Amino acid sequence: MNNKKQFSTQKLFRNISVFKEKDFLTLHKIIFMNFWTRISRFILKNQLFILLTIGVITVLLGSQTKYIKFSYTEANLLPEDHPENLNYTRFLNVFGEEGTLVVLAVKDPALFTPEKFNNWNQLAKDLEIFSEIDFSISIGNLNALKKDKKNKCFKLVPLVEKTFNTPKEIEEFKKHLFDNFPFYNNLLFNKKTQTVQTALYLDDKIVNTKIRKDFIFDKLNPIIEKFERDNNIDVHISGMPYVRTLNSQNIKAEMGMFVGLALFVTAFIFFLFFKSFRATFITLLVVSVGVIWAFGFIGLFRYEITILTALIPPLIIVIGVPNAIFIINKYQQEVKKHGNKTKSLQRVISKVGNATLMTNITTAAGFATFVFTNSQLLNEFGIIASINIMAIFVLSILIIPSLYSFMPLPKEKHLTHLERKWMSKTVNWMVRMVRNQKIAIYTSALLVIIISIIGVYKIRVSGSIIEDMPKDKLFFQDILFFEKEFGGIMPLEILIDTKKKNGVLKLSTLKKIEKLTEAIDLIPDLSPAVSVNKLVKYAKQAFYNGNPKYYQLPTSQEKNFLLAYLKNTPESTNTLENIVDSTGRYARITTYMKDVGTDKMERIQERLQAVIDKEFPSEKFEVTLTGKALVFLRGTNYLINNLVISLSLAILLISLFMGWMFRSLRMIFVSLIPNLLPLLVTAGLMGYLGIPIKPSTILVFSIAFGISVDDTIHFLAKYRQELMANKWKVRTSVYNALRETGVSMFYTSIVLFFGFLVFIISSFGGTKALGGLISVTLLFAMVSNLLLLPALLLSLERRIANKKTFKKPKMQILPKKEEE
């Protein structure tokens, strides 16, 4: 009896084991394939409901676009708790917002004529009336520091008290200003070039708001333009608030242009391939809805439009069209086979749906890895891009079959592209190359690898706040003007904590600050510093009746006289408030930096830090280098490191995904090689062409890898299917897979190539590089997937094309039998 029970139990477990081995994957296949069969039936029975639902969602998401706004601040690439951000916040807490300066300058001898010079002085007074301007410093409202012997204090006396009537008066005033006020040299004028400048300090409450934009476009620019017309003089305008405003306006203008161009280019290429207005219209409808959804999601999440999120709508067009190509191409193939519309649409959804889902997941994964970078800018880009990539897949699989179900069958002329002679010749050429020229393929690949590696060693890491801005725009030319005349517009701040009340005004501290400002003045890429020591030197000059030879730090004895005068000076005359805090403990040194790369910026920082370490012992002082220029430097380096991690994560995630789909470790390596090679080629090209690694260019690798691996999935899925159908005959399977998928892979790659190539017309350097590099990468990826991948499969057939190594996949991407 016990033996019978034992026998029955063993038999039961053996049956269960057999079921697991033989039938689990079949059950898995039934579940997934039946899922797509059910989806296809649902779509074809509820077309009107689906289209109406999509219409309602589109209207709802469209209503969210009212919440879209453009970024009015520089992108902070660092996490909030990063030490550099904490240092910058500490500086702002002591001295307030630093990026409020807008500067106007004129370099024209014609300015120094009575009428025009008076108008220039009046211009500053007219602008200062606006509530958006906190205060201004100009020749017209300049006050000279004077000694008041009677009250033993300093007072401010207007330098210009009347209008000028003759050229002689102006010449005398100019000589007096340039020769006797060294404190204002390179602040309000450049003595060498005779350039004069007006500094407008915006109210820090509006500098990061829409009010700033409205003020610049509606008030400041019209007044400046009128002055230029009336006086026939060019006024140069700059400063970070002004530059950011015009830059945002350019982003806004280009976003609309790219959406239109991407639609036109992809639709044009699509029509060239399919020769069907109906198919082109349906594709345009799908991607247009996708664009509305993209804008809607940006508004729904309350994200701002940045240089990256502005790329998402055209990106959705470029990625959405290949989805349509696969679906419509398969539909037309089915129609050509049997001419049954319903059967064709059902097969399209059930056969292409799963493969298209997988490819969109890998593309979305490439973008989703940006979420792990700890950068708000990239987090938002990654979230919105990955959501919308999956959304465009859903729209494609729902809208295209639904619309075709209402339309008549394609005409014979619309199916002729399936048998184009040139396309057949191209595919046959690829088959011949893979069959007969494997050595040539491997030799070419090896040569490309060697050349690319040499190029990689030429790559430099760089980046600056204005490097990627449109160089053909007037505001960029004005940036270069101010760099040449006044040393730059990007603020670099040094915060000095003396750790004692009134420690700043100690003579020993002033001498240390003097040494540091002298070091700054010797660096060609920095403007002369504005600091407390220069103001004290100006006070000494004023004490000696304005004699410029006394523009120097006081002696110990002179310091006592000066301090007595400074203490008696009325608060309204206090000229220290912007460079020394109210307690006298903190001082700031402000300088402005030219548009130098991060590599040069690091050397400048090292040079300054060496002086700081020498002059300011840490037990008595805490000196911090900060400012927007330095925060950007740290942000760039931080972002590049995070994007390298992001790329590694994208490769790992997609590798795991491929392993899960195909259940073969060797297949993972085979599939990665043709997709990593194009990345290496792109990196090599960057080295040879002098394109640096920076946030805008390193994005290329994660994006391109996520897209290029789609072709690999399509090819390997078809190859896996052919292996089963041809009883593990590798050569037959490879050739059949190449013939079957080659056309669609070629079509989609060409659309992607030209779609991304649209971005090279951008006036932004980063966007231009992004478009060009992704296009090149995807072109190499197409060649690699169509030649190198099949060649590898043929060469490694004994190692990977067997039932033990190449197991049945966890997910049946394509149906086992095409004709079922």
Which positions does each model-derived feature cover?
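Signature of alpha-helical transmembrane segments and their immediate interfacial
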Residues: 28-70, 402, 416-465, 477, ...
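Extracytoplasmic
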Residues: 89, 118, 164-277, 511-514, ...
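Interfacial segments of transmembrane alpha-helices in multi-pass membrane proteins
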Residues: 252-305, 372-376, 645-690, 761-764
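Pore- and gate-forming transmembrane helices of large, multi-pass membrane proteins
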Residues: 255, 284, 323, 336-373, ...
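Hydrophobic, glycine/alanine-rich multi-pass transmembrane helices and their short helix-loop junctions
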Residues: 269, 357-400, 404, 655-659, ...
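Hydrophobic transmembrane alpha-helices and their membrane-interface caps
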Residues: 280-327, 667-716, 757, 784-787, ...
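Hydrophobic alpha-helical segments
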Residues: 294, 298-411
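Juxtamembrane segments of multi-pass membrane proteins
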Residues: 433, 437-558
